[in-house]
Amino acid sequence: MSAADEAAYGIRAFTERFYTVVLGRYPDAGGFDGWVAGLTAGTLSGGDLASGFFLSPEYTGKNKSDSAFLDDCYQAYFGRAADAGGKQGWLDALAQGMTRTEVLDGFSGSQEFIALAESYGIRPFSGYGSARVAREADGIPIPVFPIPLFMLLAGLLGWLGLSRFRLGS
């Protein structure tokens, strides 16, 4: 199998996982092909795909509990069950007002998801790497943070109990 075939297979497998885990069904041809084309072209990131599935009327209409939502996140994003401590941290954050969209952003920015997405040749989230590439092209070294700085700040504020100062909505 050529490298291009392997990359195409990986993107298809990545997309199919979100259909089966998040929506609980096999993909429809039109939707599946659209997601795969966007990921292949780089116009969509893995985080875009994940948000599209988790925020879709099909998923939100299931009215899943926060616990079930997090179980789905761990399976879809990481391909594994939630660890007790990590899941409890997310449950606490949701109980204190964090939105599910913010949770999805946190999963998309995690080292585990970044590594997984990159292994499929997929950009983990919108804007990932773009500033670094542009600055390095100009010969300007920049620091690289393993997690986007705004996500670290949002997590720190939540940890400090200052959730009323949330970033975004």
Task: Describe the residue ranges of each PLM region.
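Low-complexity, intrinsically disordered short peptide segments enriched in small/polar/basic residues
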Residues: R100, A137-P141, W159-L162
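Short, threonine-centered small-residue motifs that mark membrane-proximal processing/anchoring sites
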Residues: A134-M151
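A cross-kingdom C-terminal cell-surface attachment/processing module
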Residues: I147-L167
